[in-house]
């Protein structure tokens, strides 16, 4: 049975930002490209917390080129993004998982735009922090953790300890939970633990709970300014070869740059690494929307690493661009 915690103070439950055209003089007017730009219109997004920081960065840069385009972005989780896109409430849903066949049959068209990963997070003040980081997580261990099979850290680590394990999961339908669950053969609805709303909610819960364990997208586990985990958080290594310890080639979690490099090289498994999508209802016809997608898949890729993401290979980019002209 999941216990629900609401973090109403975090991002007011839904992240929202708006980039509006300004009547005042700004630096874009001095840009020869922006000064002669004729693209106008509005673009609306909602959905995955995983993709939110990247879309905000793209929107900021896109508006420098196209200052007469208004962009509205809100979070809410991948489930909301998909629902809103199919209902045409927004132009593009932000979705952090594969598009289901039933969604595609309803008109959902997904454009892979960047890559990300879900990581296990732990409070750095955990009494068994060193043992956990030396041992890491295997698929079987993670499956048991999010099935409430471990009551104590003694159960988890096979040692003498009665310290309880507090496991956190997501309350909202989201790509992070689904991707994390798929890694060890489950679905989001099968994950047990204290259910918390949103990526920021899970990271905040683990930060406040010295015996807490959760999972987060990279951008909510690491501070992209310092590239280190957020204060109070650490990332639990994955024991990919399942030999009961974290080997040297599995140690790449101290900073986001090393983790991103490992994901790009395939040393971090996929899942829980995965592509992130912008989803429309059918082929988009709004010129501003089309140009935004093209921008994200071209010049926008150069902002991926600095924002905490992994650029797409050219083959994936080409596949997404092809969907604009079926």
Label for each model-derived stretch:
Residues 8-15:
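Bacterial N-terminal signal peptides
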Residues 1-4:
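Positively charged n-region of N-terminal signal peptides that target proteins for export
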Residues 6-7, 24:
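Short amphipathic alpha-helical "recognition" segments used for binding
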Residues 19-326:
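Flexible loop/hinge segments at secondary-structure junctions
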């Amino acid at each position: 049975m999941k216990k629900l915690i609401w973090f109403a103070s975090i991002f007011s439950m839904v992240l929202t930002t708006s980039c509006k055209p300004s009547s005042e003089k700004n630096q874009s007017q001095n840009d020869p490209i922006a000064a002669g730009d004729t693209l106008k219109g509005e673009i609306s997004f909602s959905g995955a917390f995983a993709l939110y920081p990247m879309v905000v960065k793209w929107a900021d840069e896109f508006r420098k080129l196209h200052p007469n385009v208004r962009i509205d972005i809100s979070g809410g989780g991948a489930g909301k993004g998909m629902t809103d896109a199919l209902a045409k409430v927004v132009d593009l849903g932000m979705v952090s998982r594969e598009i289901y066949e039933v969604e595609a049959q309803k008109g959902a068209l997904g454009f892979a735009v960047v890559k990300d990963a879900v990581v296990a997070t732990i409070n750095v003040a955990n009494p068994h922090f060193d043992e956990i980081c030396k041992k890491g997580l295997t698929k079987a261990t993670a499956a048991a953790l999010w099935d409430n099979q471990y009551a104590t850290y003694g159960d988890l680590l096979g040692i003498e300890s009665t310290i309880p394990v507090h496991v956190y999961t997501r309350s909202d339908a989201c790509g992070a939970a689904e991707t994390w669950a798929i890694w060890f053969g489950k679905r989001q609805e099968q994950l047990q633990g204290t259910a918390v709303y949103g990526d920021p909610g899970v990271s905040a819960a683990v930060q406040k709970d010295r015996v807490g364990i959760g999972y987060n997208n990279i951008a909510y586990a690491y501070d992209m300014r310092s590239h280190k985990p957020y204060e109070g958080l650490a990332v639990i290594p994955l024991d990919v070869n399942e030999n009961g310890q974290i080997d040297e080639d599995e140690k790449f979690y101290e900073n986001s740059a090393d983790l991103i490099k490992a994901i790009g090289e395939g040393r971090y498994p996929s899942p829980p690494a995965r592509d992130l999508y912008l989803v429309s209802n059918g082929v988009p016809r709004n010129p501003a929307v089309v140009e935004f997608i093209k921008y994200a898949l071209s010049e926008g890729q150069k902002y991926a690493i600095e924002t905490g993401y992994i650029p797409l290979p050219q083959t994936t980019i080409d596949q997404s661009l092809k969907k604009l002209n079926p």
